[in-house]
Amino acid sequence: MKFSSIILLTLLICSMSKFGNCQVETNVKCQGGSCASVCRKAIGVAAGKCINGRCVCYP
């Protein structure tokens, strides 16, 4: 039981470090849905949204 909890904790820590930074902030000003082309150029995926006047992209 102790060994399995150590393994579970290790997997949790590793997954947090790998997937913890799941958004890419840009310094490009935006309005509404104008972030698709910015995100496509920045990370290759058109998934993003305008937050506080700046584009935030999600890989």
From Swiss-Prot:
Chain coiled-coil ranges: none
Site (Hot spot residue in hERG blocking currents): 28
Chief subcellular location: secreted
SUPFAM superfamilies: Scorpion toxin-like
Signal peptide per UniProt: 1-22
Membrane-spanning intervals of the chain: none
Keywords carried by this UniProt record: Disulfide bond, Ion channel impairing toxin, Neurotoxin, Potassium channel impairing toxin, Pyrrolidone carboxylic acid, Secreted, Signal, Toxin, Voltage-gated potassium channel impairing toxin
Family, similarity comment: Belongs to the short scorpion toxin superfamily. Potassium channel inhibitor family. Alpha-KTx 15 subfamily.
Protein name: Potassium channel toxin alpha-KTx 15.2
UniProt source species: Olivierus martensii (Manchurian scorpion)
